């Protein structure tokens, strides 16, 4: 049964709420390396994304669960402020992310916000299945969230200036604004 909310505010986790990608940051931290965010791994991710993710999940699943459940990154304070504004405006807040479940729930507990996991490109499907809403706000950095952004009445996109064109071409007629990565109030 769908949850009925008048106003829904959807936030992505990695590189949106968090100042970084929690999955890769935990891998680098735990294994005391930078290999998981290296150029080499980025190339593997572009050439063979499924193999790249298999490697990452293989390494991730070997990290003790208590470490995975408690790992958090620094928050982007501008987004935390935006979350508080949306809460004050009466929005029902939810984090929708494809981050590993342990990392997603760690953020959920610390921020006192419901978190829902969705596969790449499936966030809008998960939202439509779970919620009935009148108005939706989306905050993300992901190019793969275009379908979610197209559902929105209002959006904030956190990205590098060089990536704006991608969103501009696909979101004609939408009410959105950009926050440049690294910008803080």
For each feature predicted by the language model, list its residue ranges.
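Active-site neighborhood of HAD-like aspartate-dependent phosphohydrolases
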Residues: 1-55
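Sequence-level detector for tyrosine residue identity
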Residues: 18, 24, 30-31, 52, ...
């Amino acid at each position: 049964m769908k949850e009925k909310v008048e106003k829904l505010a959807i936030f992505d986790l990695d590189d949106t709420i968090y100042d970084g990608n929690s999955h890769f940051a935990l891998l680098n931290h735990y294994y005391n390396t930078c290999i998981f965010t290296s150029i080499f791994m980025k190339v593997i991710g572009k050439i063979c994304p499924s193999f790249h993710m298999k490697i990452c999940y293989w390494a991730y699943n070997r990290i003790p669960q208590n470490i995975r459940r408690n790992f958090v990154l620094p928050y982007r304070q501008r987004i935390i402020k935006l979350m508080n504004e949306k809460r004050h405006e009466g929005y029902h807040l939810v984090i929708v992310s494809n981050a590993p479940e342990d990392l997603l729930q760690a953020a959920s507990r610390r921020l006192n916000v419901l978190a829902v996991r969705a596969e790449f490109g499936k966030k809008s499907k998960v939202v439509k299945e779970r919620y009935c809403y009148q108005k939706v706000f989306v905050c993300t950095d992901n190019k793969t969230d275009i379908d979610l952004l197209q559902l929105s009445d209002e959006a904030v996109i956190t990205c590098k200036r060089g990536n704006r064109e991608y969103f501009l071409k696909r979101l004609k007629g939408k009410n959105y604004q950009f926050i440049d990565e690294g910008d803080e109030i």
